[in-house]
Structures are given as structure tokens and as C-alpha cells.
Curated annotation (Swiss-Prot):
Glycans are attached at N75. One of its GO terms (cellular component) is extracellular region. Disulfide bonds: none annotated. It comes from the Eukaryota. This is Uncharacterized secreted protein ARB_07637. Keywords: Glycoprotein, Secreted, Signal. InterPro entries: PhiA_domain. It is found in: Secreted. It comes from Arthroderma benhamiae (strain ATCC MYA-4681 / CBS 112371). Residues 1-17 form the signal peptide.
Length: 195
């Protein structure tokens, strides 16, 4: 009798007390690399520049003069709905992964994507109440990786796909990282366009 009372009343109360983890990502996220012990990538923000993604530095953005004071700040790389950039430019900017594994985004005013690229496939897994893991889950990938670029101080972001074609050609020099996604609380859209 006592065991059935515990099962009937106590266990449901314990379930209610357990921490709730949201399964849906926030609409607008910023991503920061986490790989403790690898200071060359750990805690660096993922930035959009040159139609690619990088760790560190600043985003490359543009806003036409005619927009004037209505230009979004353009000082953060913000992802909208996991698969596109948080931009005001008509038509938006979609994200993709090239056959090489390189993460990229479309040029403003164009839907052109490199042949063979994977559109979609970006995912979010809750880590706690305030953040989640942002990653690419297509083509057998399970994480993101930062790859050194010859003659650059920045690391370029790739999906950890088999046979990735990375700058310098040596995938062993790349560093896998957890893309920690947190809600962006600034002005949205975050930029007119990323360049």
C-alpha cells in the first residue's frame, strides 16, 4: 500500500520539480566556441565574414547609406531559426554547408548556393536552461570544427564531415568544438546584410 502511494503521489511531484530544458532554440542566437584547454578557439565568438564563418574577430556587415539611421547595428553575428542570418536585406541570407565541409551563407540579393551544398541540417540540443549546442548534423557530422588558415590568425568553421577539405589540407590540425548557442537579446534583425 505504501509503495503504491509513493508511486502515485511522490513520483509525479518529483517529475514536476525536475529542471525543464527547452527543446526549441531561441529565434535568434549567437554562437561561441567551447573547447576547454584549447585557448586558440575556446570562448571565441563565431563570426560571419567573407560568406564564411570564423572564430574570433568581428562580423563583416554592410548597410546602404539610403537606409540611414534605420540600419541595424551590424556588430554581432546572429543566426535566425538555425538556418539563416538575422538580416533586414530583402530575400534574407541562407546558411549552408559546402561539399568541402565549409559553413557558408548566401550573398545578399542572391539565392545562389555552391553546387552540392547541404541546405539545412543545422540543429540545436539543449545544454541547460540558458544555452544549447548548435551543430551541423548532415552528412554524418556530429560537431563543428575550427581549422587554421595559412597566413591568418583566425580559424575557419567547418562541419566535421568525413573527407573535409580544409585550408592547408590537414584536417588533423582542426579542432572540434561545441558551438554554445545563447539567445541574442539585441536589436533584430542584427544587420542589414553580412558580407
Amino acid at each position: 500500500m505504501k509503495a503504491s502511494l509513493i508511486t502515485a503521489f511522490v513520483l509525479p511531484l518529483l517529475a514536476l520539480a525536475s529542471p525543464y530544458l527547452p527543446t526549441d532554440p531561441p529565434a535568434n542566437i549567437e554562437v561561441t566556441a567551447r573547447h576547454p584547454g584549447r585557448e586558440n578557439v575556446d570562448k571565441l565568438p563565431m563570426q560571419a565574414a567573407g560568406r564564411a564563418f570564423w572564430l574570433g574577430g568581428s562580423p563583416a556587415t554592410y548597410c546602404p547609406e539610403i537606409v540611414g539611421d534605420n540600419c541595424p547595428p551590424g556588430n554581432a553575428t546572429v543566426i535566425l531559426g538555425l538556418n539563416s542570418m538575422s538580416v533586414l536585406v530583402p530575400g534574407g541570407q541562407q546558411m549552408y554547408v559546402e561539399p568541402s565541409g565549409k559553413l557558408g551563407f548566401t550573398q545578399a540579393h542572391s539565392a545562389a548556393i555552391p553546387p552540392g551544398s547541404y541546405v539545412g541540417g543545422f540543429a540545436y540540443k539543449p545544454l541547460n536552461k540558458k544555452s544549447g549546442s548548435f551543430y551541423f548534423g548532415g552528412w554524418g557530422a556530429t560537431a563543428l570544427m575550427a581549422c587554421p588558415v595559412p597566413d591568418s590568425k583566425y580559424y575557419q568553421v567547418f562541419a566535421n564531415i568525413k573527407n573535409a577539405m580544409v585550408p592547408g589540407g590537414d584536417v588533423k590540425k582542426c579542432v572540434e568544438f561545441v558551438g554554445v548557442a545563447k539567445e541574442y537579446k539585441g536589436t533584430t534583425p542584427a544587420a542589414w546584410q553580412y558580407t
